[in-house]
Amino acid sequence: RCHDNKYDPIPARDYYQMLSTFTTTTRMNVDVWPDKVTSAITTKKAKDKDTPPQKDATRMMICGEGYDPIVMHTQGWPFFDKTYFLKRGSTDMKDGEAQQGFMQALSTPGDAKRWQWQPPAGAKFSGRRRTLSNWITDVDHGAGALLARVIVNRLWQHHFGTGIVATPNDFGKTGTPPTQPELLDWLAGRLIANGWQLKPLHRLILSSQAYRQSTQRSAEKEAADPAN
């Protein structure tokens, strides 16, 4: 946010361009709590209301200067309609408006409009999130190849306990290199070839010789491969 990534080729400008995708997103509170939870909260609020006030806290609220209300954070509205590049992450140092863009390290040089999606006339949404999804799943020019590897690694971790990349949240320089890069690439290719369907990949992993090996421990096996 305030400077370029020190380890991976991710400049701060990429951050703000990605951030602009969600600038116009409207956040709303949705009532999805069941009656049982709502009743418990109401009871707790009534109990708190009957609790004698804390003198020190009350004095602080009455006499203190306090802070200006932050409507954006408490109510989720209104929102900024623009995103700006900020020097050193400071809101006092705007460096021009940031248009929607994506990570340069995961994009081939060229016109970014290849991912752009225009909503129909009269639509009440910008289409930015659809554009983002087009870039994320583009295996030829966007982040699709990395996305496939990340998904495959998560599935492998789910079934084996540890991913082919032991740091599933970090595929960068500070993460752990894959133990079997060829296998990771091959499985990612299978995922893409199957139209991003996860079920065939689950079936493939579960029917593999690696998964069907015995998990019984012995001193001889532990000495040969203590990390397994």
Can you say where each PLM-predicted feature lies in the sequence?
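Primarily short, surface-exposed interaction patches in extracytoplasmic proteins
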Residues: 8-9, 37-228
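Sequence context surrounding c-type heme c attachment/ligation sites in exported
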Residues: 1-43
